[in-house]
């Protein structure tokens, strides 16, 4: 199963979701190829933010800093599931295999913690 997580810049939410999903899939014995991408990349912010790494590690889940990547049509077409953090992001990827996080687990859009304090990142990681 190929699962792709998408957020705005691939620096906060989608890398956290990737690490968390990978951890729990492995713990459950589910074979999954998990990755994450952004709709856009800011050249000044092109890797996983430190606050995101800290938030996921607080959950005792391993996560590594990664270089941000932009989602492509090929990535979407080759995935079984593409999971966006917001409806607006889903609307930017008009394919049948694209779902919002809330469509799959409920709870509404996942707000972007970018630019906020560590607590915002911790709350985001916990929700994911």
Segments from the language model and where they lie:
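Hydrophobic structural packing positions in well-ordered secondary structure
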Residues: 7-10, 83, 128
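Conserved active-site segments centered on acidic
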Residues: 1-77
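Phosphate-binding/catalytic loops
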Residues: 81, 87-127
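Short, surface-exposed, polar/charged, turn-prone segments marking secondary-structure boundaries
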Residues: 32-34, 61-64, 108-112, 126-128
């Amino acid at each position: 199963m190929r699962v792709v997580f998408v957020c705005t810049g691939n620096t906060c939410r989608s890398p956290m979701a990737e690490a968390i999903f990978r951890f729990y899939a492995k713990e459950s014995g589910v074979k999954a190829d998990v990755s994450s991408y952004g709709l856009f990349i800011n050249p000044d912010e092109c890797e996983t933010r430190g606050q995101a790494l800290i938030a996921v590690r607080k959950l005792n889940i391993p996560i590594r800093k990664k270089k941000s990547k932009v989602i492509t049509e090929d990535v979407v077409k080759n995935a079984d599931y593409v999971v966006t953090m917001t409806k607006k992001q889903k609307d930017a990827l008009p394919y049948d295999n694209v779902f919002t996080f809330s469509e799959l687990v409920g709870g509404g859009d996942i707000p972007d913690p970018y630019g906020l304090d560590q607590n915002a990142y911790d709350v985001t990681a916990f929700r994911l």
